[in-house]
């Protein structure tokens, strides 16, 4: 299949620049994965499409305020550091701009010297290995000094950092939010559980690779970035029990989906596991465990449009996207939601 097969027309004004005032009152498009039939609802109505005995799987990763603005020691030149991946306690793989000022041995400071950094090495991809020096707890310093690393298509500042976190976020480590989860409130989750639907959590730390465009014409030649995931024994047991009893596994977000499909064996059973995944899901892939998917509207020609197409069909999904544009749905990270059932 060709990359062009996953393109669609999107007016720029439909790219949401800020979240919905109330998380669970955004719009929800419900798509039947077999027929492609579309219904228009609001997000809190998702409960009407969940059955007692189903299991909702959510990603509890928490976004690090990983964008740091500082100065080069000696010259005072302004620098931007974006933390990509933790190597050990105080060492991170980091994207540094402007790169020409970030040579090995160069020193930088943030917050008037509360946090200091030195470049230890430079990778083939231009990313820097950076060692940080500070007193206290790194995450607390990052909370004070760091900014949210918003996607490039969001140009407005966040009023509140928590707007880019799910209400159940717990494990620090993501460079971007698992955005399908942003629509849930604690009240809605309580109502879902009260209806007899189980909720379980896994962790996948979302990397910046999620925003990297596909650069090959033949989609089968594309290689995914790798991301760290974790599934507990308790969550695995609940998922397996749900399937044994005939319930559906409803994945919240493409990150939960990729984690479940990585861990599941050929019979669709999962077990406690952690590791790195670079699973690439596109049409032709046979889902092993995920029955339904709650997700946002994704970028044209992205691997995420391919992933949702694999659960339904390319024609069904692109038709749903066309209907979404015609009905002025809001797109991307802060946009409206889709439930493929």
Swiss-Prot record:
One Gene Ontology CC term in the entry: cytoplasm
Keyword Transferase included in the entry's annotation: yes
Keywords, ordered alphabetically: Cytoplasm, Queuosine biosynthesis, S-adenosyl-L-methionine, Transferase
Catalytic EC class: transferase
Pathway it works in: tRNA modification; tRNA-queuosine biosynthesis
Pfam families: Queuosine_synth
E.C. number(s) listed in UniProt: 2.4.99.17
GO BP, one annotated term: queuosine biosynthetic process
SUPFAM superfamilies for this protein: QueA-like
Highest taxon, organism lineage: Bacteria
Compartment(s): Cytoplasm
Catalysed reactions, semicolon-separated: 7-aminomethyl-7-carbaguanosine(34) in tRNA + S-adenosyl-L-methionine = epoxyqueuosine(34) in tRNA + adenine + L-methionine + 2 H(+)
Stored InterPro entries: QueA (IPR003699), QueA_dom1 (IPR042118), QueA_dom2 (IPR042119), QueA_sf (IPR036100)
One function term, GO molecular function aspect: S-adenosylmethionine:tRNA ribosyltransferase-isomerase activity
Membership in a protein family: Belongs to the QueA family.
Job of this protein: Transfers and isomerizes the ribose moiety from AdoMet to the 7-aminomethyl group of 7-deazaguanine (preQ1-tRNA) to give epoxyqueuosine (oQ-tRNA).
PANTHER family, per the entry: S-ADENOSYLMETHIONINE:TRNA RIBOSYLTRANSFERASE-ISOMERASE
Database matches in HAMAP family: QueA
Assembly and binders: Monomer.
Protein name, UniProt field: S-adenosylmethionine:tRNA ribosyltransferase-isomerase
Native source species: Clostridium acetobutylicum (strain ATCC 824 / DSM 792 / JCM 1419 / IAM 19013 / LMG 5710 / NBRC 13948 / NRRL B-527 / VKM B-1787 / 2291 / W)
The encoding gene: queA
